[in-house]
Amino acid sequence: MAAWLSGLLHDVGRFEQIRRFNTFSDADSIDHALLSTEILFGTKEDASCGRIRQVILDPSWDIYLYKAIKYHSAYRLPPDLSEMEKTYCQILRDADKIDIFRVNLETPMEDIYNTTTETLKQAEVTSEVLQAFKERHAVLRALKKTPVDNVVGHISLYYE
C-alpha cells in the first residue's frame, strides 16, 4: 500500500513548483520532494494544512509515505532510517529512476534538457561529473554545470 501510494503522490510538489517558478528544475527553484511532503503532511509550523487525509485515512502508513516521498530525489538516504523505511525509500527511488529513463527514451532531448541538440553535442562534460561517472555513482546535482552534465547525471542513475 505505501509503495503504491508513494508512487502516486511523490511528485505532487511538481505542480506547485511549475506554478511558482515556471520550471521543473530543483536547482533553479525548490526541492520538489520537500515541497511534496509539505503539501501532503503540512509544515513543522502547521501540520494541519497537509492534505494526506484526503487521500488515505489510516495514519499508520504516514511515516513510510513521508520518508519515501521526502527522500526520493535525495543524493543519499539518511543513515538513521529503519529497515522498513529504507525499503520503501528504495522502492520509490528505483521506480522514479525507471520513469526518468522512460522519459529520456520517449521525449526529445531538447524538451528534457531545455537546450538545443547542437548545444548538447558541443558541451563538454565537466571533470567532476566525469569523475563521479567513472566512480560508478550518481552525480551530485551541484556538480552539474553544462547541459551535457545533466545527460550524464541521468545515465549515472543506473549505478545507484
Regions found by a protein language model. Name each.
Residues 1, 9, 20, 74-160:
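Divalent metal-dependent phosphate-bond-processing catalytic cores, especially two-metal-ion Mg2+/Mn2+ enzymes
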Residues 30-48:
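An active-site-proximal "capping" alpha-helix that borders the catalytic cofactor pocket
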Residues 1-25, 36, 40, 65-75:
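His-Asp-centered metal-binding catalytic motifs of divalent-metal-dependent phosphohydrolases/nucleases
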Residues 20-34, 110-113:
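Post-HEXXH active-site segment of zinc metalloproteases
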Residues 1-5, 47-70, 85-91:
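Acidic/histidine metal-binding catalytic segments
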